[in-house]
């Protein structure tokens, strides 16, 4: 069984245990905060938008530096992040909906709930906890599930980041006409990463969609390798959690977009 399959089985177990029902009962409702739409930054900013991630660990990185997460979010906003991503998976990524609930209150930026969503109730919990964006991973959803969950999210005034890794997944994503697609440079089955994977998939981009490169971005040089593919933004976690100088590092990632290749 791959790590991805293991995670999805775990999510199904949580659904059976009414884990998400309990979260809806105990979380403070932070779902009506007015935030700028991520799509506006992606469409109108002349530099790459950065979704700055809060994470504690992952299957490929067992432990990241322990930070004051409240201060980390404030610094992300201070130094130019366009959105905040917060992992909510407890077992594999060390996150929680309680953390999302707490941190979403201290920022006016768009907030992404980073999790493995396979059911509508997970979207309900994400919104209640304060998310304005949810992640939909094409690899773990059927076409019907993808369409249903995307519609459910947008009908509840949430943005959706539709994540793909292969050309086939990109084709499936394009069928629902999403506003934002994330190209994951990490193969979720093997957790191997290649930042140049973005360039391969962006050859098949469409003009009515914005594209974000996710995973494997550790330096400004990594961004320079992919900016000419006409990406609109980046999702960066590990490198931002590790750096000791956010004031220099985060702004250095916001390169000028390639506006001439559409």
Curated annotation (Swiss-Prot):
First-tier enzyme category under EC: lyase
Pathway in which this enzyme or protein is active: Amino-acid biosynthesis; L-tryptophan biosynthesis; L-tryptophan from chorismate: step 4/5
SUPFAM superfamilies, alphabetized: Ribulose-phoshate binding barrel
Catalytic activity, as annotated: 1-(2-carboxyphenylamino)-1-deoxy-D-ribulose 5-phosphate + H(+) = (1S,2R)-1-C-(indol-3-yl)glycerol 3-phosphate + CO2 + H2O
Keyword presence, Lyase: yes
Biological processes annotated in GO: L-tryptophan biosynthetic process
Gene3D superfamilies associated with the record: Aldolase class I
GO molecular function, one term: indole-3-glycerol-phosphate synthase activity
Enzyme Commission number(s): 4.1.1.48
Entry keywords, A to Z: Amino-acid biosynthesis, Aromatic amino acid biosynthesis, Decarboxylase, Lyase, Tryptophan biosynthesis
Keyword Amino-acid biosynthesis: yes
InterPro entries in UniProt: Aldolase_TIM (IPR013785), Indole-3-glycerol_P_synth (IPR045186), Indole-3-glycerol_P_synth_dom (IPR013798), Indole-3-GlycerolPSynthase_CS (IPR001468), RibuloseP-bd_barrel (IPR011060)
NCBIfam families assigned: PRK00278.1-3
Name of this protein: Indole-3-glycerol phosphate synthase
Native source species: Staphylococcus epidermidis (strain ATCC 35984 / DSM 28319 / BCRC 17069 / CCUG 31568 / BM 3577 / RP62A)
Gene that encodes the chain: trpC
């Amino acid at each position: 069984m791959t790590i991805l399959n293991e995670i999805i089985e775990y999510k199904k177990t949580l659904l059976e245990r009414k884990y998400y029902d309990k979260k809806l009962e105990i979380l403070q409702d932070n779902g009506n905060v007015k935030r700028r739409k991520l799509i506006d930054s992606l469409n109108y900013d002349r530099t790459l938008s950065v979704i700055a991630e809060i994470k504690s660990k992952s299957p490929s990185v067992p432990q990241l530096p322990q930070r004051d997460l409240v201060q980390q979010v404030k610094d992300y906003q201070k130094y130019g992040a366009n959105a905040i991503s917060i992992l909510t998976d407890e077992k594999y990524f060390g996150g929680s909906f309680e953390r999302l609930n707490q941190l979403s209150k201290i920022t006016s930026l768009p907030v992404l709930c980073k999790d493995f969503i396979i059911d509508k109730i997970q979207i309900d919990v994400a919104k209640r906890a304060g998310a304005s964006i949810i992640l939909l991973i094409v690899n773990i959803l059927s076409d019907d599930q993808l369409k249903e969950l995307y519609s459910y999210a947008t009908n509840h005034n949430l943005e959706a980041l539709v994540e793909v890794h292969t050309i086939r997944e990109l084709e499936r994503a394009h069928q629902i006409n999403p506003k934002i697609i994330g190209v994951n440079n990490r193969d979720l089955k093997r957790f191997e990463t290649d930042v140049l994977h973005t360039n391969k998939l962006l050859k098949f981009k469409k003009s009515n969609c914005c594209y974000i490169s996710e995973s494997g971005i550790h330096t400004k040089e990594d961004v320079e390798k992919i900016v000419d593919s006409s990406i609109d933004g980046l999702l960066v976690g590990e490198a931002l959690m590790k750096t000791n100088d956010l004031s220099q590092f985060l702004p250095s990632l916001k390169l000028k977009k390639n506006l001439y290749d559409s």
